[in-house]
């Protein structure tokens, strides 16, 4: 892992991205994605991680921002991934901070993630899920065919 500076800072941002068309699932529809971004700066180098809070899991934008902000002092003191596991519960906030820490480590060392994570070789991407927006049968069939 990269050497830890005592001058790290954590910044939390909210971003909104439009979605092409309307994305519908059984719990509702949306035309934009609300994203929380965690940025960890160390000597001018910035690691970035993001997350999308889901009400289904008891998360909200405000709650996730508060969770991320609650570890700002620990990040400033050099918190790494291992300590993060006990500092935040599993969920969107921890994901954003964890990704920012990994991104920062890669940028500080100039190494790709697989080397920083001490893997033998890069891993191939794996599709773990694919969600189709609710629509007519014909449109859903066309979307499924286009994605396969």
Go through the PLM ranges and name each one.
Residues 2-148:
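N-terminal capping/lid subdomain adjacent to the active-site entrance of alpha/beta enzymes
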């Amino acid at each position: 892992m990269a050497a830890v500076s005592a001058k790290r800072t954590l910044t939390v941002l909210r971003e909104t991205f439009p979605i092409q068309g309307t994305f519908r699932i059984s719990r509702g529809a949306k035309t934009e994605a609300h994203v929380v971004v965690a940025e960890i700066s160390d000597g001018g180098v910035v690691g970035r991680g993001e997350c999308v809070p889901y009400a289904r899991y008891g998360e909200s934008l405000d709650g996730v921002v508060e969770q991320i902000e609650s570890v700002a002092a620990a990040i400033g003191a050099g918190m790494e991934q291992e300590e993060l596991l006990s500092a935040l519960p599993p969920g969107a906030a921890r994901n954003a901070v964890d990704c920012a820490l990994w991104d920062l480590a890669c940028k500080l060392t100039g190494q790709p993630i697989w080397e920083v994570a001490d893997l033998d070789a890069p891993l191939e991407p794996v599709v773990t899920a694919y969600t189709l927006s609710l629509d007519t049968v014909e449109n859903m069939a066309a979307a499924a065919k286009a994605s396969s």
